[in-house]
Amino acid sequence: MKNQLYYTKPAKCFEQALPLGNGRLGIMTYGNLRHERLSLNEDSLWSGYPKDQNKADAHKYLAACREAIFAKDYAKAKDILNRDMHGHWSEAYLPLGNLRIDYDRAYKKNYSRTLDLRTGVAVTRADGLTQTVFVSHPAQLVVGHIESDRPFSATCRLDSLLQSTVTAQDGTLLLTGQAPEVCMPPYYTQGETVVQGSRGMRFCAGLRADGQVTCTGDSLRIENRKEVTLLLSMATSYVDFRSMPTADEKARMLAYFDGAADYPTLLAAHIADFSALMDRVTLELEGGDDSLPTDVRLKRMQKDKSDQSLIALLFQYGRYLTVSGSRPGTNAMTLQGIWNEQVRAPWSSSYTTNINTEMNYWPTDAVGLGECFTPLVDFAEKLAANGSSTAKAYFDADGWCACHNSDIWGATYPAGFPDGDGDSSCYAVWFMSGAWILNQLYTHSLYQKDPAFDEKLKGMFAGALAFFHSSMTAHNGQPVTCPSISPENTFTDNGQRSAVTYMPSMDREILHDFMENCRALGLDAPVIDQVAPAPDGRVPEWAENYQETEVEHRHVSHLYCIYPSHRVQSDALQAAAKQSLLKRGFGGTGWSLGWKVCLWARLGDGENALRLIENQLRPINPKALIRVRGGGSYPNLLDAHPPFQIDGNFGVTAGIAEMLIGGALPKCWSGKVTGLVTPDGTVSYAFKNGKRVE
């Protein structure tokens, strides 16, 4: 069972189901051999259409907002921002629908279901019947194969939570529908939260089967067969982020069926494609029983911490999710990767660019999957194109910028409560995500060593540099960002609680790296001094000595300088970062735990990194409500915020890679790693009791 997720019961909910994907198509398979469900996603299916939701006159209020901040009238500054300087919510990543396979009887005896991370194949077995499912990147199809030692019968249906119809046509079961024009996040409850309209994206899914089947009405019937292959195709009318979604979704969908090979050929091509990526990196950690079901191992890990091979499985799972969720030509992964079953998913399953989107791509280069980084580059190009409108509207500035939330249409404005009917100041008022993503692209370039990519990068950096040249303001004789925040955190100053301030440490650290990267690309950029340790021995979070309101806050934004920054910091700053981390604690959301694994690993402390990995392997009940601490893992090893957010899976994978590359190994680790990547080459070695074996 090495590098496999294994269970002895069908899934009852999303957090127990198994994810499969090819970057564009994502499914969750439940493994119920009486009433099987495959939930379906297509990565371009979003609500909305291209529209400018910047507040064109927001810059008229900028001077008054800055004056209030510098005068420490935080209430006034917040009111101005909420009323006059926000945009609208970004749009939502949507579920396409479900494929349901209702077998004529239940298959339960000797039940098992597995997901092979090396091959990207899910297999469910019981009572002589085997159901195999994978999502082929070469064929761009979902493939299901059912075989049994005696004849079986089943009825297949398609359905969707979106406006849709199901018909049968020429042996194909068709699901056609349209996404809404507007889909508000679930925490917004005022007025109409889902607006259907007629301008939203259209979608189409088609199901076919080989051999003799009956496809009429709203179902496809399989009768007395010992073997059948199902092919499922999906497509949308999405064109690009600038254009109305008017492509022919049905023609696109049907085209994927053209020339589809037989099942053995489809399977062989899929495994060759998938395993070629997965085989680049191996990790063995001694200790643990791979023959046990994964959910059992997860529970046991909390008792004795001895199942180190479960950590290796978690590491490879992050790589697996990258291969399944992000390929060249697809869209960047969202808060849930490409897997979402809800119309109004938590935080709209969109792009949160004050940590989460970036974290999705932290491990990609180091774990040998550099080509899977491409969608983040494409996403950055969207932001650079749209961000000039935001720079002009909010600062009357040149260049481009982007804020904390985006979508497939490349939203760059400060997303939040429209019309000032709520307080969005602790997350929306942050114009630094474009620079952060560019810094991440620069780090990627160190691996790629591609002059053409560097030239593309230089153009995007030049635009963002122009924004900072014309948007920063002087305070106490220094250029500062204002207004700004330390993402989602608050402070107290003179009895006033606020998020809004100027030049928080994260801004300074991002700009320090950004300007150095500009100069490395041949651009003339000023020097921004790095943050310095505070008198209390920690890295300060803000420009002034404010009082913390939440000492163990989930964001560790002020430690950007340690990780994900690729630059080596001074001994003094590293020592201060350790004190900051100790004060922050060892809890938090799932993605927060992953970030702290990366930080402790970068600081060379494998024991504290391991402590956080163990916390991330804390079993979480799928019924757990949304909360901002108490993260862990669901039975299917997907990251629990809770709720599910995929970024934590990538954060912990990046952290484990950092531990192995930097030699920050805990004493209990013995094993072997091969194929990890640095800008200077590959890393492969054996280790025993936390020490490298030459």
Feature-to-residue mapping (PLM):
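Acidic/histidine-rich catalytic neighborhood
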Residues: G463, F467-R519
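Alpha-helix capping and helix-loop boundary segments enriched in small/acidic/polar residues
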Residues: K305, W347-Y351, T364, D421-M432, ...
